[in-house]
Swiss-Prot record:
Keywords: Carbohydrate metabolism, Hydrolase, Metal-binding. Transmembrane segments: none annotated. CDD domains: NagA. This is N-acetylglucosamine-6-phosphate deacetylase. Its cofactor is a divalent metal cation.
Amino acid sequence: MDVRIKCNSEEPESPEQKILASSQRLLQFTNCRLVRDHRIIHDDLWVRDGRIVNPEPVFFDERTKAHCRIDCGGAIIAPGYIDLQINGGYGVDFSYDTETIEEGVATVARGLVKSGVTSFCPTLVTSPSDSYHTILPRIPAEVPKGAGILGIHAEGPFINPQKKGAHPEHCIQTIDKGLSTLKETYGSLERIKIITLAPEKVTDPEVIGQLVERGITVALGHSMASLSDGERAVQQGATLITHLFNAMLPFHHRDPGLVGLLASDAVPHGRTVYFGIISDGVHTHPAALRIAYRTHPQGLILVTDAISALGLEEGVHHIGQLPLQVKQGKAFIAGTETLCGSIAPMDECVRIFQKATDCSVVYAIEAATLHPAQCLKIEKQKGTLDFGSDADFVLLDDQLRVLSTWIAGVCVHRTVK
């Protein structure tokens, strides 16, 4: 699928320079299929000033023609992918690289666009308080030519040590002074968009609601919670489950735990419980993916939960506290067969999920676009190709491989054949 660009201007710069570097011109993407309104339609996409525009007033009111027409060669145009849980990548670990966090986040943001990700939440695992105080204020608000930063996902430290996973147990804390405990731990709540906590460890019934009032999405995870614990947290305002099936009680017919929230009748009317799920072909069995999809499709969100080895070549890499070995698309503790995290990029997760569940292409894409945007209540700006939304999108071939990635109407990545 070749993308061909034709511009009307007589300016000396080449058409490719125009289209790749400017968001101010009126752009018309033709010969494409749009993911819009839960289906794939044959239509043109119009972009100007970093947003998707309605062509009708442009034609009839402004009487303006497109400055550049981009022939997409029959490609699918989908909203840009949104990753709500990613611990690092390209040799960067958000939780440990405290001295170089600005450069590290920029490296990851620019790397993610290769896999179609246009927005993400840098995720910090359970850490000492002084690490939060150092890292949080230094994470950049934006990165030129990189995926947008929606805010930080603080995965811990208010979790259950019995389900700590790879989180350092000595850094786990309890919420003993209500909201003030969180403020003291993180230093500030301003940059935080998501907090993962264990609901059974929350003794103050007002904490979750207070976080939600501040625009923070409360996620449940790394937990031994019963279903009733989870239902109580949802009734208090929690709306997300962190990496479903991982670091929580397994489903049991007498008490299904947090997994039971997917079918709970105690969820307040009109509220959706969302859940992240890792479809990297390693962490979650295909049958588990199908169960989650068929039980609660409107809440399913694809996340990578990727670690620092994402995007690195095969071999041994010395990152953070342990040497890692990347082989056969998996990350191991070097010299062992112990898996140490996911390294599948988002576009691969979308393809794996679509194949495992046999869902529609549109649904697989929406699980990485619309659903995370809805979870964060930003669906008016991100996650769709609706008129007025941000012009963050990805061109895909029929196998859902990334051809190019666009942020605010500017091309930030093109796949080289």
